[in-house]
Amino acid sequence: NDIETFRTWIPFLLQQDIQVLTVHLRTRKEMSKVPAHYEYIDEIVKMRDEIAPDTLLQINGDIKTREEGLELVRQHPGVDGVMIGRGVFENPFAFEIMPTEHTLDETLALLRLQLDLYDEFTAEFGPMHFQKLKRFFKIYVRGFAYASDLRVALMDTNTTDEVRALLDEFDKQWEAKKAEDAVAIEAK
């Protein structure tokens, strides 16, 4: 758990003839409680260049958007790529080339896409625990009126079909509420 262990561990890994090395710039003990140790990136690049120059080097830690990742690569020549981990939990559109604000409809459409991909994956590879999918609901369902109520209802679902039905019902109620609010504004 000592951050300095990377000086022996990374050379060992690089000697294993690996194609890609992803370095999470924190110890297991630190997890995400402290900022990523970007100060070690150039030293890690140098190790890779000396020991296994053909191994691709990917960095992970505190990268929340594609642009932040590209900036990190620009600041540290020799880094071949980045991995966005928890950043996607703050922004499900973290990989966009041109970041933009998204509507609730777009965000819920992305949730529906994740449901479709989940169904495709389980059809090809067998059933997965639906509970694991539920941890992603908060990514999409937050920051708008009734988000908490919708999240609570989503957590009570047991299938992707139930989630879709709930989202469809929410869409109808949301549209009705927006229309009601528009009429109230016009009446003023």
PLM region spans:
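Active-site beta->alpha loop and helix N-cap motifs at the rims of alpha/beta catalytic domains
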Residues: N1-E4
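Active-site loop ensemble at the mouth of alpha/beta enzyme cores that anchors a bound cofactor
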Residues: P35
